[in-house]
């Protein structure tokens, strides 16, 4: 069977070969993620070109995602490169410039002394080392180590519960976004989203450049969970980024947040990616743990559009095996059922009602496929959220829409000429599906489109059609 859940792979040092990137595409990579927290522009340009070449060579749609670093807060550098903070020690984190020593080190967040208050927690290196703020003395935040461990240059800091006032887009992010858009990426992920207004800052940069692409909100902060519905509505897609989320929130809350975010995204026809440590042990080992296999399976059962591999493919020893393993797990779950938790949302929009009706007609008539003509991808996403067992085929004249739909559940997208009439649409369906050799004359399909063609948001037509028959 054809896999319906999509796979996002992070590119990095482990994937710096043309043949390996092509192998990843052939194994099931649907979206290639470029992580702008690492690498330089030359690295990203080469990676981008590798993906485009592999996509063209294999005929598979592969989207390219630029993941912006966001206002990531880090320690500065230590004179010795590293040290070990023991429980009970006092350490100072300063917003001033200094050469780091064992008990005093700088931070990239220059408002820390203004935002911190006694009792705040400071977590270093994804929570491996924990501090509590005792006092603020000038530029220094004085802390006590409550959970000790090794620390080294540029380790990340999380500040759960602190009212952090860093901007949603740093200067680096603006430069990276400009580069990525000019390069031609298909979508952008914004890190550490806190408010629905954060997307407006990204759109301002996009509008200056003259190119808008979908923006994915990475859910990593408690504020994002508090504003979840508004963020889902404002952004084009969401990513449940469980790494930082698991540091900022109690661990036991993360699975429930994941399920809630997936359901809310589906209710609003927004793609949702589940990320972080899906097959983490495969960074070092050729096989995942049983718990990781269950984690992947449960994300599929929750209704996620796509699952993401991070270190497994960017720096891991077995990137190709990781993709193949994830694909096998997804397929095994889908062989049992493509169903997801039922949607409670009752559509009240024209496109929402039409998508439900097309799904119902197709399933009751035992159609061979649902076919949707789309200019923006919206109608296809509304169909995809229903998790129909019927194949979902998207026809578009826009290559960027084909690439963007690569992260949407169950969607196979084809580039077709711009249509001038509904009769032309139906003839194109016959031509394309017969060329696939998976369909034959007389097979029943349900077509969803807008009439007259050529207007975004004009979906108003459902046509029940037998391939090759003159019913136009």
Swiss-Prot record:
Question: Is Transport included in the keywords of this UniProt record?
Answer: no
Q: Which residues bind substrate?
A: 33, 243-244, 276
Q: Where is this site: Transition state stabilizer?
A: 218
What this protein needs as a cofactor is: Mg(2+); K(+)
**Source species, domain of life:** Bacteria
Q: Which residues are Mg(2+)-binding?
A: 220, 244
Entry GO MF terms: ATP binding; kinase activity; magnesium ion binding; potassium ion binding; pyruvate kinase activity
Record-annotated residues binding K(+)? 35, 37, 67
Q: Which residues carry this modification: Phosphoserine?
A: 37
User: For this protein, what post-translational modification is recorded in UniProt?
Assistant: Phosphorylated by PknJ. Dephosphorylated by PstP.
Q: Which reaction does it catalyse?
A: pyruvate + ATP = phosphoenolpyruvate + ADP + H(+)
The Gene Ontology CC terms held by the record are: cytoplasm; cytosol; plasma membrane
Example of a GO biological process term: glycolytic process
Enumerate the residues binding ATP.
35-38, 74, 155
Q: What is its EC number?
A: 2.7.1.40
Q: Pathway listed for it?
A: Carbohydrate degradation; glycolysis; pyruvate from D-glyceraldehyde 3-phosphate: step 5/5
Q: Which UniProt keywords apply?
A: ATP-binding, Glycolysis, Kinase, Magnesium, Metal-binding, Nucleotide-binding, Phosphoprotein, Potassium, Pyruvate, Transferase
List the cysteine pairs that form cystine: none
Q: Which InterPro entries match?
A: Pyr_Knase (IPR001697), Pyrv/PenolPyrv_kinase-like_dom (IPR015813), Pyrv_kinase-like_dom_sf (IPR040442), Pyrv_Knase-like_insert_dom_sf (IPR011037), Pyrv_Knase_AS (IPR018209), Pyrv_Knase_brl (IPR015793), Pyrv_Knase_C (IPR015795), Pyrv_Knase_C_sf (IPR036918)
Which EC class, in a word?
transferase
The annotated subunit structure for this chain is: Homotetramer.
Similarity field: Belongs to the pyruvate kinase family.
Its name, as the record gives it, is Pyruvate kinase
The UniProt gene name for this protein comes to pyk
């Amino acid at each position: 069977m054809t896999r319906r859940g999509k796979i996002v792979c992070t590119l990095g040092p482990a994937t710096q070969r043309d043949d390996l990137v092509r192998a990843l595409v052939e194994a099931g990579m649907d979206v290639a993620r470029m992580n702008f927290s690492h690498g330089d522009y030359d690295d990203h340009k080469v990676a981008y070109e590798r993906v485009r070449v592999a996509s063209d060579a294999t005929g598979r749609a592969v989207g390219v995602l630029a993941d912006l670093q966001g206002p990531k807060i880090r320690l500065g550098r230590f004179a010795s490169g590293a040290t070990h903070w023991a429980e009970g020690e006092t350490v100072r984190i300063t917003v001033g410039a200094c050469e780091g020593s064992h008990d005093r080190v700088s931070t990239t967040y220059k408002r820390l002394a203004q935002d911190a208050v006694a009792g705040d927690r400071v977590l270093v290196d994804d929570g491996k080392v924990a501090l509590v703020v005792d006092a603020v003395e000038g530029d220094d935040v004085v802390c006590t180590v409550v959970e000790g461990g090794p620390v080294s240059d540029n380790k990340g800091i999380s500040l759960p519960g602190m009212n952090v006032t860093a901007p949603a887009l740093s200067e680096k992010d603006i430069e990276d976004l400009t580069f990525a858009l000019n390069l031609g990426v298909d979508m952008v992920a914004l890190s550490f989203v806190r408010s629905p207004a954060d997307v407006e800052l990204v759109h301002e940069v996009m509008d200056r450049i003259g190119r808008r692409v979908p923006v994915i909100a990475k859910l990593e902060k408690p504020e994002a969970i508090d504003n979840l519905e508004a963020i889902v509505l404002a952004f084009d897609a969401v990513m449940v980024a469980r790494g930082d989320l698991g540091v900022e929130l109690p661990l036991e809350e993360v699975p429930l947040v994941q399920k809630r975010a997936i359901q809310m995204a589906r209710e609003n026809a927004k793609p949702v990616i589940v990320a972080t440590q899906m097959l983490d042990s495969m960074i070092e080992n050729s096989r995942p743990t049983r718990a990781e296999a269950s984690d992947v399976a449960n994300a599929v059962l929750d209704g996620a559009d796509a699952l993401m591999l991070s270190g497994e493919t960017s720096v891991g020893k077995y990137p190709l095996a990781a993709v193949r393993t994830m694909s096998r797990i997804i397929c095994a779950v889908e062989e049992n059922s493509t169903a997801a938790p039922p949607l409670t949302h009752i559509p009240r929009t024209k496109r929402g009602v039409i998508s439900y009706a097309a799904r119902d007609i197709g399933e009751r008539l035992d159609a061979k496929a649902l076919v949707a003509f789309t200019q923006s991808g919206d109608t296809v996403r509304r169909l995809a959220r229903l998790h129909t067992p019927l194949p979902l085929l998207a026809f578009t004249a826009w290559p960027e829409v084909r690439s963007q739909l690569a992260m949407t559940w169950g969607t196979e997208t084809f580039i077709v000429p711009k249509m001038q009439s509904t009769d032309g649409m139906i003839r194109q369906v016959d031509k394309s599906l017969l060329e696939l050799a998976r369909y034959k004359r007389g097979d029943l399909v349900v077509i969803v489109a807008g009439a007259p063609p050529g207007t975004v948001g004009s979906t108003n037509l459902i046509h029940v059609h037998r391939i090759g028959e003159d019913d136009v």
